[in-house]
């Protein structure tokens, strides 16, 4: 298939000319072979996801700020995860809702770069936050350094690493190492997975190693060690003193699994189109993993509230005291 590559104000855009001839410029009009109702459905979906995410994650951050009992190293990391999810929805969710409501990326180049960078950056911050959470569980239960306890300053250093490291590996496309480009459906922006350029491929490979494989490897290692520890210690010896830690560990596992369920399809899709950039995919099919990944920002705070008795108790107390 004849493939046309277009650069619009620094944002690269690949399209199959046979399919998308009516609108070579993604900023001036929608894909004409898709009925308007497709974009209306996506706009409605993004409105619901964005609204729920903003409300839920703001509630988690507000509760942690209001109740001193929740200001613990573990909760600092979870609040950081909520902040990342909140910012993903505030930037990417809002822009995606507006562009789908219009049917094309009418906001122009600056918004494309903003959405592409923001969603990628905050998404990777969330991924690395889960990796730090898994390390916190490993540190607390396995005690690799003996009686050394994890304190607030240690959590702060971990979060500083998360934000700095994520920024280092998501900012390069803004300055020319790869690019943030309009997606096939024309209403969202993402890293340029479809590029044939070897230079761009070096970034994509580096990005996957540092922002997906490394944090996932850290999660697998920490929970592998954690399971070994729990198997060695009998239920009687673990006792009631360790019961809260086991509950928190289960909560973190559920959060990690839920996040991976949301983002793994998008990661797999990105690998496929990077390896086969000329592959033809229906725009709706190509967009599905990206839109599905945004649901991760909705269910993480729900898991946190319902599986953490301390948080649910404080929220219930706050609600009924106001009532």
UniProtKB/Swiss-Prot annotation:
<feature type="transmembrane region" description="Helical; Name=1">
    <location>
        <begin position="39"/>
        <end position="63"/>
    </location>
</feature>
<keyword id="KW-0807">Transducer</keyword>
<dbReference type="GO" id="GO:0009881">
    <property type="term" value="F:photoreceptor activity"/>
</dbReference>
<keyword id="KW-0812">Transmembrane</keyword>
<keyword id="KW-0600">Photoreceptor protein</keyword>
<feature type="topological domain" description="Extracellular">
    <location>
        <begin position="1"/>
        <end position="38"/>
    </location>
</feature>
<feature type="modified residue" description="N6-(retinylidene)lysine">
    <location>
        <position position="294"/>
    </location>
</feature>
<protein>
    <recommendedName>
        <fullName>Vertebrate ancient opsin</fullName>
    </recommendedName>
</protein>
<keyword id="KW-0597">Phosphoprotein</keyword>
<dbReference type="InterPro" id="IPR000276">
    <property type="entry name" value="GPCR_Rhodpsn"/>
</dbReference>
<keyword id="KW-0681">Retinal protein</keyword>
<feature type="transmembrane region" description="Helical; Name=6">
    <location>
        <begin position="251"/>
        <end position="274"/>
    </location>
</feature>
<feature type="topological domain" description="Cytoplasmic">
    <location>
        <begin position="64"/>
        <end position="75"/>
    </location>
</feature>
<dbReference type="Pfam" id="PF00001">
    <property type="entry name" value="7tm_1"/>
</dbReference>
<dbReference type="InterPro" id="IPR027430">
    <property type="entry name" value="Retinal_BS"/>
</dbReference>
<feature type="transmembrane region" description="Helical; Name=7">
    <location>
        <begin position="283"/>
        <end position="307"/>
    </location>
</feature>
<feature type="disulfide bond">
    <location>
        <begin position="112"/>
        <end position="189"/>
    </location>
</feature>
<feature type="topological domain" description="Extracellular">
    <location>
        <begin position="101"/>
        <end position="115"/>
    </location>
</feature>
<feature type="transmembrane region" description="Helical; Name=5">
    <location>
        <begin position="203"/>
        <end position="230"/>
    </location>
</feature>
<keyword id="KW-0675">Receptor</keyword>
<dbReference type="InterPro" id="IPR050125">
    <property type="entry name" value="GPCR_opsins"/>
</dbReference>
<keyword id="KW-0716">Sensory transduction</keyword>
<keyword id="KW-1133">Transmembrane helix</keyword>
<feature type="glycosylation site" description="N-linked (GlcNAc...) asparagine">
    <location>
        <position position="200"/>
    </location>
</feature>
<feature type="topological domain" description="Cytoplasmic">
    <location>
        <begin position="231"/>
        <end position="250"/>
    </location>
</feature>
<keyword id="KW-0325">Glycoprotein</keyword>
<feature type="transmembrane region" description="Helical; Name=4">
    <location>
        <begin position="155"/>
        <end position="178"/>
    </location>
</feature>
<dbReference type="InterPro" id="IPR017452">
    <property type="entry name" value="GPCR_Rhodpsn_7TM"/>
</dbReference>
<keyword id="KW-0472">Membrane</keyword>
<feature type="topological domain" description="Cytoplasmic">
    <location>
        <begin position="136"/>
        <end position="154"/>
    </location>
</feature>
<keyword id="KW-0297">G-protein coupled receptor</keyword>
<feature type="transmembrane region" description="Helical; Name=2">
    <location>
        <begin position="76"/>
        <end position="100"/>
    </location>
</feature>
<keyword id="KW-0157">Chromophore</keyword>
<dbReference type="GO" id="GO:0004930">
    <property type="term" value="F:G protein-coupled receptor activity"/>
</dbReference>
<feature type="topological domain" description="Extracellular">
    <location>
        <begin position="179"/>
        <end position="202"/>
    </location>
</feature>
<dbReference type="GO" id="GO:0016020">
    <property type="term" value="C:membrane"/>
</dbReference>
<dbReference type="GO" id="GO:0007603">
    <property type="term" value="P:phototransduction, visible light"/>
</dbReference>
<feature type="topological domain" description="Extracellular">
    <location>
        <begin position="275"/>
        <end position="282"/>
    </location>
</feature>
<comment type="similarity">
    <text>Belongs to the G-protein coupled receptor 1 family. Opsin subfamily.</text>
</comment>
<keyword id="KW-1015">Disulfide bond</keyword>
<feature type="topological domain" description="Cytoplasmic">
    <location>
        <begin position="308"/>
        <end position="323"/>
    </location>
</feature>
<feature type="transmembrane region" description="Helical; Name=3">
    <location>
        <begin position="116"/>
        <end position="135"/>
    </location>
</feature>
